[in-house]
């Protein structure tokens, strides 16, 4: 049976080896609330151990987009899993939820145990940094669905927040401050354009760029904001949060704003990493479009009362994150976001 299955394009033994290789990485992500071990039909998590009065579960799912193609083409698979985790946990974090567990899905042309191990290592690194248990996953070998060497990666995260602490933006008011947390580069959006520009420019990805190679710059993993935001939440009343992903500033910052309010952003209040200047020069596009595609150096925003700005910046600095007061909430019924220095 297994021989016939292998002849049809599925290598069971390679799958077994991949599971064996990834197990040590997965185990280091475990939390005390996880019941049972690896390999069950369903993964279990004991919410009662969180000692929450009225827990609200928050879930999110996402992928890494065509950044995967850049990783695959350059045989660099050990950090792309961090991106998968970050795209999910940063999203659910905007509600004030603490990420609890994560599941991954890898679909590939052919299971290569060494590659699968590197992918899952990255996922585990992201989970370990955010205290999120990698509680389950699926690796699917589908030769007829993908070209040789190709794979896709997606993730699913679940977190919890006390019902009374749930952040939905309803407490946002005119005059409150917007704090921007620095990104780690491009993160995981806009890579169809990025890859096009890499090809057209003819650069050698191993050449130096701004203190590291081009490849390291383009594959720098998405920043994880869980630890600094959870630390901030203990000290400051957060009114709203946004994860700056696809659609850049224009699509993400207005999300969750009450009707009649808008965000006024000073684009001179934070530094723009050189990689975005390079992309803009290569693409020959205007600055407004850049802010409509990329994070431009700000990967996450927090809305707080003005009186809490100094304390917020201090806490985030202690947590190792560069942060800036980048704007404020204003009254505007027509235009949900204004970018000073761009428009």
Curated annotation (Swiss-Prot):
GO function terms (MF aspect): ATP binding; phosphoribosylamine-glycine ligase activity; phosphoribosylformylglycinamidine cyclo-ligase activity
Cellular location(s): Cytoplasm
Pathway in which the depicted protein is active: Purine metabolism; IMP biosynthesis via de novo pathway; 5-amino-1-(5-phospho-D-ribosyl)imidazole from N(2)-formyl-N(1)-(5-phospho-D-ribosyl)glycinamide: step 2/2
Annotated InterPro entries: PurM-like_C_dom, PurM-like_C_sf, PurM-like_N, PurM-like_N_sf, PurM_cligase
Pfam families xrefs: AIRS, AIRS_C
Gene3D superfamilies: PurM-like C-terminal domain (3.90.650.10), PurM-like, N-terminal domain (3.30.1330.10)
Gene: purM
Signal peptide start and end residues: none
Reactions catalysed according to its record: 2-formamido-N(1)-(5-O-phospho-beta-D-ribosyl)acetamidine + ATP = 5-amino-1-(5-phospho-beta-D-ribosyl)imidazole + ADP + phosphate + H(+)
Major localization class: cytoplasm
Family designation: Belongs to the AIR synthase family.
HAMAP family hit by this protein: AIRS
Any Gene Ontology CC annotation: cytosol
Name of this protein: Phosphoribosylformylglycinamidine cyclo-ligase
Assigned EC number: 6.3.3.1
Superkingdom, taxonomy of origin: Bacteria
Biological-process GO terms, alphabetical: 'de novo' IMP biosynthetic process; adenine biosynthetic process
């Amino acid at each position: 049976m297994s021989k016939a299955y292998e002849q049809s394009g599925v290598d069971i033994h390679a799958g077994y080896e991949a599971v064996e290789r990834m197990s040590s990485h997965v185990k280091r992500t475990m939390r005390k609330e996880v019941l049972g071990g690896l390999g069950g039909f369903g993964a279990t998590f004991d919410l009662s151990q969180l000692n929450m009065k009225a827990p609200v579960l928050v879930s999110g799912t996402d992928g890494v987009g065509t950044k995967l193609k850049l990783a695959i083409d350059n045989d660099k698979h050990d950090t792309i899993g961090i991106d998968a985790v970050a795209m999910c946990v940063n999203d659910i974090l905007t509600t004030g939820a603490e990420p609890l567990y994560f599941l991954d899905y890898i679909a590939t042309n052919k299971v290569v145990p060494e590659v699968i191990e590197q992918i899952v290592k990255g996922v585990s690194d992201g989970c370990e940094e955010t205290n999120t248990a990698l509680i389950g996953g699926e690796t699917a070998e589908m030769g007829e669905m993908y070209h040789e060497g190709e794979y896709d990666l997606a993730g699913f995260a679940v977190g919890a927040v006390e019902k009374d602490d749930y952040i939905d933006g309803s407490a946002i008011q005119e005059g409150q401050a917007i704090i921007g947390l620095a990104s780690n580069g491009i993160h995981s959006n806009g890579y169809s354009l990025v890859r096009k520009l890499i090809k057209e420019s003819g650069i050698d990805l191993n050449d130096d760029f701004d203190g590291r190679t081009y490849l390291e710059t383009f594959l720098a993993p998405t920043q994880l904001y869980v630890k600094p935001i959870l630390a901030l939440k203990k000290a400051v009343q957060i009114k709203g949060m946004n994860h700056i992903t696809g659609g850049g500033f224009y699509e993400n910052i207005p999300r969750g704003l009450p009707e009649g309010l808008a965000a006024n952003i000073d684009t001179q209040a934070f530094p723009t990493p050189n990689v975005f200047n390079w992309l803009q020069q290569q693409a020959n596009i205007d600055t407004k479009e850049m802010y409509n595609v990329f994070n431009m150096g700000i990967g996450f925003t927090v809305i707080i009362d003005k009186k809490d700005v100094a304390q917020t910046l201090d806490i985030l600095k202690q947590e190792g994150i560069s942060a800036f007061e980048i704007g404020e909430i204003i009254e505007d019924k027509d235009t949900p976001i204004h970018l000073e220095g761009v428009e």
